[in-house]
Amino acid sequence: MITSELPVLQDSTNETTAHSDAGSELEETEVKGKRKRGRPGRPPSTNKKPRKSPGEKSRIEAGIRGAGRGRANGHPQQNGDGDPVTLFEVVKLGKSAMQSVVDDWIELYKQDRDIALLDLINFFIQCSGCRGTVRIEMFRNMQNAEIIRKMTEEFDEDSGDYPLTMPGPQWKKFRSNFCEFIGVLIRQCQYSIIYDEYMMDTVISLLTGLSDSQVRAFRHTSTLAAMKLMTALVNVALNLSIHQDNTQRQYEAERNKMIGKRANERLELLLQKRKELQENQDEIENMMNSIFKGIFVHRYRDAIAEIRAICIEEIGVWMKMYSDAFLNDSYLKYVGWTLHDRQGEVRLKCLKALQSLYTNRELFPKLELFTNRFKDRIVSMTLDKEYDVAVEAIRLVTLILHGSEEALSNEDCENVYHLVYSAHRPVAVAAGEFLHKKLFSRHDPQAEEALAKRRGRNSPNGNLIRMLVLFFLESELHEHAAYLVDSLWESSQELLKDWECMTELLLEEPVQGEEAMSDRQESALIELMVCTIRQAAEAHPPVGRGTGKRVLTAKERKTQIDDRNKLTEHFIITLPMLLSKYSADAEKVANLLQIPQYFDLEIYSTGRMEKHLDALLKQIKFVVEKHVESDVLEACSKTYSILCSEEYTIQNRVDIARSQLIDEFVDRFNHSVEDLLQEGEEADDDDIYNVLSTLKRLTSFHNAHDLTKWDLFGNCYRLLKTGIEHGAMPEQIVVQALQCSHYSILWQLVKITDGSPSKEDLLVLRKTVKSFLAVCQQCLSNVNTPVKEQAFMLLCDLLMIFSHQLMTGGREGLQPLVFNPDTGLQSELLSFVMDHVFIDQDEENQSMEGDEEDEANKIEALHKRRNLLAAFSKLIIYDIVDMHAAADIFKHYMKYYNDYGDIIKETLSKTRQIDKIQCAKTLILSLQQLFNELVQEQGPNLDRTSAHVSGIKELARRFALTFGLDQIKTREAVATLHKDGIEFAFKYQNQKGQEYPPPNLAFLEVLSEFSSKLLRQDKKTVHSYLEKFLTEQMMERREDVWLPLISYRNSLVTGGEDDRMSVNSGSSSSKTSSVRSKKGRPPLHRKRVEDESLDNTWLNRTDTMIQTPGPLPTPQLTSTVLRENSRPMGEQIQEPESEHGSEPDFLHNPQMQISWLGQPKLEDLNRKDRTGMNYMKVRAGVRHAVRGLMEEDAEPIFEDVMMSSRSQLEDMNEEFEDTMVIDLPPSRNRRERAELRPDFFDSAAIIEDDSGFGMPMF
């Protein structure tokens, strides 16, 4: 017994007699061991004692007062303070077997049911986190509403947590123990106690009142208890139904016997038993009806998502457990309506509940009407914004399809089909399982049995693979074949690994009567086949799915190795045949050449399959000679690179074949170049084609192979110089020559960095790089855009590679190879970016229309421009190009935000990390450039309200936001920015005289956007610096042309004691900055810096350095909006400790926010509604309870419960006559029966409840 319970027995001493000191030892033992079961949490004793006579009751209760410990399982249990353990603590600790705890309580109940029920009541109160305790006189003399109101006042207002919401493994275990306790309690009481018309009435009445409370903890805990209680009762009802059926069968069997063999006594016993079972069944149904109508109907619409989820989860259990009673439309509609809940966790519980029902195909007839009604909603949930909900919705749709294919229309299926291409893997896998069941699991059993003996194209998988290809083509997402394969991998792995069938479909001619595959189908099948090979060999999802490669389990690793061996052994033989058949098709060949990278190349040697390797090399050589497409040549080059890996024994054989191939191409290239250069402008198309085709092949191979010994750079350089000098070189040859020369330089650098180069080697490479950089720089002025773009990218790459970072890592000897771009080259690179990246949208659209390019080409062009900008931005970030060049990029931040905003923002962030001050000077320079351009267009008299001026100010505001919230870190940078801005504004004097404003004065209005980033002390310093440029005449001016100066001065002067961050003056400014106020805050004792020490501390610094004011204390930071402590409704609340609803409840419950605003009016309305509805009686006593733990809305309704359809409105307005409406009959032993009898299942009560907002539900 807890200490607070001691007054319970002290107050009831008038009902008991004193315990005799002369009592026997046996009596004392009994008092300690048995009668102390009246205390909460008494587990059963291992040694059973004789029951006490009624005369001993007083002595026992007196003994309880003197007892200082409790028992569990016959052993004393105490907490650290020596106080006895309560029932709540026993359940929380979970050390005792739950059945023992329940048996002990039952034993106590048989002796004194009031004391036992008091224990149980306090158990529910304490499980809600309430510190109060119900005393015996409260239990006997007070109504539930009064008890609940009293307990509400005992809540701890300091914390909003209660056991069901507390974090940690102990409290998670408590929840399961709590639910287990209730289930075991009903199970152990199911044969007698629950029918005594006292225990269950008391518990149900209490839980009904608690579930109707405004206190979340009470509602949450009591709803969980009531739902688990209902589940246990459903189990009891199910058992009773089974017993009734058995009894009825026994009765029928006995009655059908011949009269001579019939036992009349047995018939009477069976009739009596059937009658008792029927009475018990009726009693249980009354209890379930009371819980359902008194608690579930209201709480499944609760404002708290956890409470709604509990209700939906349990009703799913009832319908699955006792489908004969609960699986009907009267109960299913609650799940259907809640599919529209606004919280994902509630929708998830609905889907889980339905899945458990649709899993049983025998239940489908009972679900038919529900399926027709809510199928559209379920299908739409496959696109739920919560991925977990979407996954379960797809699984539910799959179950519906499995049970009844006619239930889903073609449109429904198509809505799920496209999800196999989702980037979220669980969604895609679930959709893949649906696709598998829909397309690959419907076969004629006889036909399938006949085909099962066949292999290859005639096997069952042959038709399925054709279906997969057709699906892939119809989806028109050919670039996502890897996603489709990954989606089907778990459900259709056997089909996807049938490479034998796939290759037979590709290689063999169709038999008579069989339709041949089209060219598109063959291309799709090859693409899918390559994706399945990749998936099997790598054993992880494709790029874009999943967070990365996970560690494979031993089983997965073994499967991966087996699959790799299987595919290697198969395609070593078939790949040369496939290449031979499709050698003329570039797309097919490029895909097929991806396969060797997934081989286990050791099998060539261990399996004695060198002849197949020779066949493969022969086919690859044939493909290289036949094709000039970049994709094909790169695939061939990569295949050679893989086969030439040094760790494999086949390396020598492949290297010889590769060298022979390169020798042929180099000889051909050298001769064709000589011919082309000799003929000059008279060269014909054949000469040009010979050079271009051979150069393309060599360039593709040079990317992955070191071809420096063939000295390709010489002839490439000759082609480039000739093209520059004479201008007649075809652009494709120039582009390929540039790329090939670039690869040659990189391979030379690799040799030098890997070895110990001589000084001569370094000088030779330096000369090569210098000459190539000069050629690239000259190409920037080429008339052909592809040439210019190629030259620009190579320039940026080489300047990055041969920058000062080349010497890092102990490679100081490479200093001769470092190149720093001169001013002229930097200017040319910047000009190229301005001309080719920041182009007008109108020009782009016109060019696209002229070239008849579609949307895909526009995206490709944008991607190319983004690469150009990123390449130049890297030069700025790595300090290869001067940072001030970034000003021309930063000024386009707003205009091209959608296209390049992320790149510019990242460049700005990186440059600030390098040098905050220089970055700030670059930002102000970009604004000055925009301002100068505007002045040139509109003249010195700018319209401050024009869109152009507003655009510059908006850009300045965006730049100011990038400085962040830490003003100490950005202090010097912001001060430098203001200094440069002031100097720019007063750089030129007005030629008309000093009485006229300087031409750039309007720039101060732009500069004022950065005033909010100045510390208060720095504002004074900046203001002092500004005044150095002002004359007395300027200070006295108030005309409109001087408004920028007035605005800027005000932004610096304001923020004295209020510490406001910025003030925008002038009629044209519509933006306001956040205001930080210190009003109402206690003063902080800190050292204040004198104003004199701040003046001119950084005014005389150089352009690149600025001295910050002396060491300053951290400024006092206040919240942007100070929370007021006043309470508008405080006068209406009597309790001094009361306050508004808890902040979490208030923030997340819009109904509370409305109700607090309209409190007086709602109070009157609520009071009338409460008096008119009997079931609101419980709340009448708690209307003015502690506000800190209450939610104003007693019956909150969430808006998204219903579907917006007329049919559901009719469903909502029906009278629910088909639901159980059996009420418990009145009895003198039933407590507060009036609270359970009213029919709150009336639809009118649901819709007209005072918790609504006065708005329609639909």
Curated annotation (Swiss-Prot):
Subcellular location: Nucleus; Chromosome
The keyword NADP belongs to this UniProt entry's keyword annotation: no
Biased composition (Low complexity): 1062-1075
Annotated region (Disordered), positions in chain: 1-59, 1055-1148
Feature: compositional bias, Basic and acidic residues: 1137-1146
GO biological process: cell division; mitotic spindle assembly
Gene Ontology molecular-function annotations: chromatin binding
Positions of modified residues (Phosphoserine): S24, S756, S1062, S1065, S1093
Domain SCD span(s) in chain numbering: 296-381
Post-translational modification: Phosphorylated by PLK1. The large dissociation of cohesin from chromosome arms during prophase is partly due to its phosphorylation.
InterPro entries xref list: ARM-type_fold, Cohesin_Scc3/SA, HEAT_SCC3-SA, SCD, STAG
Annotated crosslink Glycyl lysine isopeptide (Lys-Gly) (interchain with G-Cter in SUMO2) location: K1161
PANTHER family documented for this protein: COHESIN SUBUNIT SA-1, STROMAL ANTIGEN
Family to which the UniProt record says this protein belongs: Belongs to the SCC3 family.
Functional summary from the UniProt entry: Component of cohesin complex, a complex required for the cohesion of sister chromatids after DNA replication. The cohesin complex apparently forms a large proteinaceous ring within which sister chromatids can be trapped. At anaphase, the complex is cleaved and dissociates from chromatin, allowing sister chromatids to segregate. The cohesin complex may also play a role in spindle pole assembly during mitosis.
Name of the featured protein: Cohesin subunit SA-1
Gene designation: Stag1
